[in-house]
């Protein structure tokens, strides 16, 4: 009986401990345990790396990205530093997951994707190509080579929304001297 009284008396204190912030902290620490195991396996378990993980503003996204790099077999100190310092980690994570889903994620595609100047339009382009079943190594290379990728991404979006994203239409967009004109045309037809 005494135990139940003590439990009831301490219940408000226990409820105070179970806050959203504490729950997030516990989840991030459990993710950190898995990452620490991976780091140990890859011989990159250092105080500096663990501290960088703990202080990162987006620990869950960082953990997912590290696990993905490990899964693909390209987790090393150099790639870890790139990921830790990247300002658009959420976009990087989504893009790498897209590449991994279609089987074209490797060290080379990692370096090419992360060195691209416009990550958000690149991620969107890859997403729409994947949705249409057209994300191949060749199409990935085509998208990477484009200087003006934003109109490409928008064109792919409008073609996808209209159910007309085909390899032929994709190649037409790539060949067009002013892909932004395609965007305006597709948008006009979509609105009418």
Language model features by range: what are they?
Residues 1-192:
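Ankyrin repeat (ANK) tandem alpha-helical domains that serve as protein-protein interaction scaffolds
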């Amino acid at each position: 009986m005494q135990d139940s009284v003590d439990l009831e008396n301490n219940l408000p204190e226990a409820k105070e401990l179970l806050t959203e912030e504490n729950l997030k902290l516990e989840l991030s620490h459990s993710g950190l345990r898995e990452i620490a195991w991976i780091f140990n396996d890859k011989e990159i378990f250092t105080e500096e790396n663990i501290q960088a993980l703990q202080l990162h503003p987006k620990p869950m996204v960082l953990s997912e990205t590290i696990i993905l790099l490990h899964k693909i077999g390209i987790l090393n100190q150099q790639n870890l530093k790139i990921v830790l310092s990247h300002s658009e980690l959420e976009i990087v994570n989504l893009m790498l997951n897209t590449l991994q889903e279609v089987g074209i994620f490797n060290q080379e595609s990692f370096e090419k994707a992360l060195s691209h100047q416009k990550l958000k339009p690149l991620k969107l382009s890859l997403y729409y190509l994947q949705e249409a079943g057209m994300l191949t190594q060749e199409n990935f290379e085509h998208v990477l080579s484009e200087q003006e990728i934003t109109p490409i991404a928008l064109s792919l979006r409008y073609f996808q929304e209209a159910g007309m994203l085909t390899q032929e239409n994709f190649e037409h967009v790539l060949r067009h001297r002013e892909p932004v004109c395609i965007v305006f045309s597709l948008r006009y037809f979509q609105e009418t």
